[in-house]
């Protein structure tokens, strides 16, 4: 059996979009910890009900503040070293970037990214923030 850390952007997606995956992992006997930016009592109750631990993270999904991003990375490194997962699966852009970096820094060998859609970075807008983010994500 594996220990698995799932890192997502928002807690609701853990239930709505990844719920069946989490249930399947648990039914196969894997230890699963799920984390995302923010708290949601319904999601936490659902995850507890299927045997998944939930950790709320300090994630500002659309912020470009490097200090907040470093705090997010620091918390991910602490969580990854504490849980010592065999596998890390991250989805959404910031969790992928910082989650997989934290996993690598913590010595996790199996690191996986899941990016769906184009997201905020590629939405129609001419703002400087979006152009910078689009360039970074495309790199």
Language-model regions: role of each:
Residues 3-5, 104-120:
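Active-site proximal beta-strand in glycosyltransferases
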Residues 5-68:
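N-terminal strand-loop element at the rim of the active site
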Residues 17, 67-74, 109-110, 119-139:
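Nucleotide-sugar donor phosphate/pyrophosphate-binding loop at the beta->alpha transition
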Residues 33, 89, 111-113:
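Structural detector of well-ordered beta-strand residues that form the stable sheet scaffold
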Residues 50, 83, 106:
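Active-site charged/polar residues at nucleotide-handling catalytic sites that mediate phosphoryl
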Residues 80, 84-86:
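Proline-aspartate-enriched helix->loop->beta-strand connector
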Residues 90-96, 115:
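Short His-centered aromatic/hydrophobic patch
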